[in-house]
Amino acid sequence: MSSARAVAVRSRLPEALAWLAFVALLVVPALAWPRGWMLGYLAQTAAMIVLALSYNLLLGTTGLLSFGHAAFAGLGAFVAAHSFNRYGLPLPLVPLAGGAAGAAFGALFGFVATRRAGTAFAMITLGIGELVAAAAWSVPEWFGGAGGVSIDRAAGPALAGWEFGKPMHAYALIAAWCVVAAVAMRVLVRTRLARLANAVRDNPARVAALGTDPCRVRFAMAIAAAFFAGVAGALTLIDVEVATAESVGMLRSGAVLFATVIGGTTAFFGPVVGAVLLTFFSVFVASVSRAWLLYLGLLFVAVVLAAPGGASGRWRAWRDARRHGGARFDARRALPGAGAALAGGVAIVFAAELAYALQFAQNDARRAVIGPWRFDAGAPLGWGIAALAAALGVGLAHAARRWGRGAPRTNGPAFADAIDTCGAACGSAELKARDAGDVDGSTNAASAANETNAVSIASTTSTTSMTSMTSTTSTTSARHAARVSDNAPSPVFEVAAEPVGGGVHAASAPPALRMADVSKSFGATPVLVGIDLTIRPGERHALIGPNGAGKSTLFNLIAGALAPTRGRIALNGIELGRRRPHAVARLGLARSFQQTSVFARMSVYDNLRCAALHAPRARRRWRRGPAAAAAIDRAADAALASIGLAAHRDALAGSLSYAQQRALDVGLALASGASVFLFDEPTAGMSREQARRTIELIRRATAGKTVLMIEHDMDAVFGFADRVSVLVRGELVATGSPAAIRANAAVRAAYLGEAF
């Protein structure tokens, strides 16, 4: 117990030190230099910290890029100012009023914006930001016109002898609210809502398939971010005692974006680092150089190119690599690299200051002040220094690159396969491309398009060979393709049915899945025609057919990702109608995807915890605190052990091999606690042994539950399924037991091949 406690203490020590440094940043300079300029600088920093942390609730936690975040801070400041002036609200409560106003406007605008993600969300917020900025000048009665709305913080009532007219007292209030807001946001990012927001950031289609509407998660996080933005706006109001139209403008929205990206979105304190740097540039660098915005822009570009994770992300990558023995100091590479950065910085500063001196020269005074030196912008000396520094930087950078070629990389640990070693052919198919903005209608658009093309080609060709199995499936399935005449009508084979598991109870219960006359067309091209299929509770049913037959489209119809053109689908006796994917999942349906669909930037364990959150029992008692959390953790642990990834518990899902991600994809479906499972080619890209283990895992984990599986590996199909259905060119041509399907000569001729 003592060793476990020591490990827990050590794991919490870095965050405790970060909080200590954060508080010291706000307190120590104010006590050491209690002057007006220092207190004003610290107040600006504190307000920007809160604003940047609130912005990271959108960008880092939920994956939403906003160009109008400052609008909520500015609107919160205006509401807070009017509350203080008109209603005598005590100054310590002014940030609360600003937060409430920010949340209200966040709900109003977020209701529209969060229906989309990605580029669409960014463009909507850009329009909202411009709308609010225009309104600030068009409604002077509320926004105060050019002068804004001012307050006199000394006019409010004193609190325990504190008169907030004094700069130190006002700053103490701002710093206290900054710490309180930061703690509140830290608590928020540890909640289940934030965990779901991380999942929505990585894979909204998968979240919908688990049973949560991604739009609702985005909406909730947008309101939370707007609340804290309103608090930040009120803190700025307390500092400068005026709310102006500039506070809702695009410049401030861009500033908070810069701060968050420079500091890093992957660590909680990353935006704090960015806010400190941004305020330093806007105050100290701006006081000595007119080119400070240029320097800030160059820093932003450098961070995006060289350290996409920001300063904190770079630090964490180095720390993790060092922890796993991958980070070693290589003087031959590090020293020239540092020298190149220094020389490049000198070249940029000289060139920028000389250019600004030429551009803004007054009375023929073209002097550029660089540190203690003055240079004539028209003389060659300064430009020569800039050119020399640039040449030196290029040379050192080339040397660092050349000498570092043989140095070991610091990409962190290499992870072994969970099931078995995956072939090189598997690795190229790891990642999926999906529009995060429309998870309901385009979940598998590429798959549906492929099937549409396959059907249209088949309908216009006199004779063609049935497409062989996908290149990523096992070598066994490649033998099962056969030629079919497209001029002949699709054969309907009568195959004797055999009773399946479920017993008397299954016979009396409604079908687990019932499809009646289900058809789907894309434009004028039919993909599915008149599908009639009933799957009993507890049945293991396999759906086979050539590529382009419409199998994945049928899965998307069942899961709610697509709406049928005609027909009805019922799950456990409930008509699905036009329910969206999250609503269908809540009725007890879980699915895996044709391509791996996991939450790449979350750990394997957090992936499974996110799925376990959606189990029916967890949904019923998610508010019950520690007991419910412990139950979710136990479910995630059980799923982790069952899929063989216990050794990679804390690894990011995106770092796993293809076979491991396939196993995790299956594990997400299993951990959801559903009663009906759809598995879309769960063994695709696996070796025969990997496929055997995966099928055995599914058989064991879904005992007594209903399974509908698409699979091209006929050995897996005939060894797993109670019944098999054959889909050819969008029509269901046969349904029966594996033995009957295997024995039917017409089915073998159409699809399986004579080898079976």
Describe the residue ranges of each PLM region.
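Transmembrane alpha-helices and adjacent helix-loop boundaries
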Residues: 2-420, 491
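A short, surface-exposed alpha-helical micro-motif characterized by mixed small hydrophobic
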Residues: 717-719
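Conserved ABC transporter NBD signature motif
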Residues: 567-575, 586-587
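The feature captures the beta-strand-to-loop junction immediately N-terminal to the Walker
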Residues: 544-546
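Conserved structural motif at the start of ABC-family nucleotide-binding domains
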Residues: 513, 528-530
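Catalytic Walker B motif of ABC-type/P-loop ATPase nucleotide-binding domains
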Residues: 677-681
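Helix-to-loop junction immediately C-terminal to a conserved catalytic motif
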Residues: 559
